[in-house]
């Protein structure tokens, strides 16, 4: 009886551990893949400390930054008035559907439909510190 209880406990713990690992993997993005996806973003955005803005603002340090806050960049009135602080959730939503999150912004990009690619991009942006 005790042996059966130990076996059941071990199986239950193994199942919980496997579920926790799977949930963690789904919840986060892969920064290395995100860096690869960023090549599309790099057409308009720089990503290095001190690099000049391009058509879009430099995204170095974007996580935690207030939207429309880089001095000297010509933001749309909509972006300036948005009041957004770029958290992980806000970045995910914006990358997926920019015009839905900030209607009237100037970014000429429809968004990324693949949720995993969005997660990967945000994971990469989080490394830019």
Predicted regions and their residues:
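Generic cytosolic/nucleocytoplasmic N-terminal low-complexity/intrinsically disordered segments
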Residues: 5, 32-34, 89
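N-terminal signal peptide c-region/cleavage motif recognized by signal peptidases
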Residues: 20-24
